[in-house]
Amino acid sequence: MEEQTTNVIQIYVNGTEQFNASFDFNITDVKESTDTYEFYIIGLFLSCLYTIFLFPIGFIGNILILVVNLNHRERMTIPDLYFVNLAVADLILVADSLIEVFNLNEKYYDYAVLCTFMSLFLQVNMYSSIFFLTWMSFDRYVALTSSMSSSPLRTMQHAKLSCSLIWMASILATLLPFTIVQTQHTGEVHFCFANVFEIQWLEVTIGFLIPFSIIGLCYSLIVRTLMRAQKHKGLWPRRQKALRMIVVVVLVFFICWLPENVFISIQLLQGTADPSKRTDTTLWHDYPLTGHIVNLAAFSNSCLNPIIYSFLGETFRDKLRLFIKRKASWSVVYRFCNHTLDLQIPVRSESEV
């Protein structure tokens, strides 16, 4: 009798342990499913906002910059040439972003070709954008400190050569991480990330820290030069407007790309403090919603550049008004667009600082 009682108790204990283990597992499962569902809903909402408000501006705006400037090749200035190349880089990222922002479950990362292809586009755009903005800051400093008629460095031939070298440098800087980017698997989740410690340091250093140090130095010198130029009242308004556009472009780039670089830097610092974490899952896996937000912020830069270029660039507004005048079928359309672009555009000399 005692033996039967013992067996019953043993069966009850075993069954209770199995039930508790199963219950704990189910609770954990439900919690993970709830967190995943919340991330998906919030991420989908943010992606929809980006697609409705920013993507059309970035896609149409960058195409418009290319079309308008290519239709006025004879009036293209050196800053225009740099902004055309910047628009090409931005257009690549904007087109890529439409796939990225809705890829919340990372399904296409199952395919190594797509993983590599998307990473290539992102890297080329990042490097080309920051390299062009860095060079534009240097070009602005040269324009302000040199006589436009006698500056041997600031010519259209040199500008075209500079653009070619910048694209080559962007591609070369991309090749190293491009060759080692691969899919990473964590259970049933797939991630595409160049999770190599040295490569990540390279991205943050030459793609963010060094360029912005150069930009900061250039603008410090530009501010000092402009303060000295206040005596020449005729030059000050024109130089101030040209400087305003490039400062806003760089500032927007910094605000948009800073979160992602901070996100990467945190992972790098964790790997420095504990080398065993260098092979662990990335922060994009541990904090998917934060990773999604910093990606959207980075994509937003390429969407905002056309707005800055259109409203702050008087040369572009002038060209856009002429382009609309030629293409518009109805005078009402032309008058509306002409009023929107600002009727009072001051007369400028052919060379623009």
From Swiss-Prot:
Subcellular location: Nucleus; Cytoplasm, Perinuclear region; Cytoplasm; Cytoplasm, Cytoskeleton
GO process annotations (BP): apoptotic process; brain development; cell differentiation; cellular response to estradiol stimulus; heart contraction; negative regulation of meiotic cell cycle; negative regulation of neuron apoptotic process; negative regulation of oocyte maturation
Cytoplasmic compartment residues: 62-81, 134-160, 224-245, 314-353
Molecular functions per Gene Ontology: G protein-coupled estrogen receptor activity; steroid binding; steroid hormone binding
Membrane-side (Extracellular) residue stretches: 1-40, 103-112, 182-202, 267-292
Xref: InterPro entries: GPCR_Rhodpsn (IPR000276), GPCR_Rhodpsn_7TM (IPR017452), GPER1-like (IPR047143)
The protein, known as: G-protein coupled estrogen receptor 1
Organism: Danio rerio (Zebrafish)
Lineage: Eukaryota, Metazoa, Chordata, Craniata, Vertebrata
Gene name of this polypeptide: gper1
